[in-house]
Amino acid sequence: MRKLNSSKLVALLIGTAVIFLILVTSVSAQAKLTERSKLAINGIGPIRVGMAVDEASKSAGIRLIRSGSGDLDEYQCFYVQPKGEPKGIAFMVTKGRIARVDISNKRITTISGARIGDNENRILSLYPGQIKATPHPYVSRPPDNGKYLTLVPKDAADKNYRIIFETSKNRVERFRSGKLPEVEYIEGCS
């Protein structure tokens, strides 16, 4: 009788340990920034607009490094990107905080499934009644006929955020999300 109880106890402990490991692995996999992370109107995966760079790095389980041009003053405008993977994600930083997320990776999608390569009609169908189309400032003339397809949210809580899809020849070439006014800066920090 005593062996049976200790066998049950061992089985229970092993079962509990396995469940715990599965849960921990699942939670940590969800928290890490990857190509499977979804772009939202206010961030991507675990990174949110308004986070400090160190906070975003810890939240996403990655190291963010400074990239490209921008002012050397940390309270002005500059970009950071993941060191290593995932590629094709850049975070604009203004006043020491993440202000927008720029996507050039074809594998990354929005929460609704929009991605690079989608045609304009698909974007319109994913966000019915929420897209404002304007001419692209650089490629609006034929043959490119480029546009900015800007998601203007219906929810009052999101009124200061946008997702902007840049198109050329009827296809999304890149997209970004973030807060106003930074999300609308045509040339990033330039």
Predicted region positions:
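Second-shell loop/turn segments in exported
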Residues: 40-46, 107-114
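N-terminal secretory signal peptides that target proteins for export/translocation
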Residues: 1-7
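A cross-family detector of function-defining hotspots
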Residues: 31, 51-94, 115, 120-186
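Post-signal/leader-peptide non-cytosolic segments of secretory proteins
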Residues: 41, 96, 101-103
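Sec/Tat signal peptide C-region and signal peptidase I cleavage site
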Residues: 25-30
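The feature marks the first
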Residues: 34-38, 42-56
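Bacterial N-terminal signal peptides
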Residues: 13-24
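Short, solvent-exposed mixed-charge patches
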Residues: 188-190
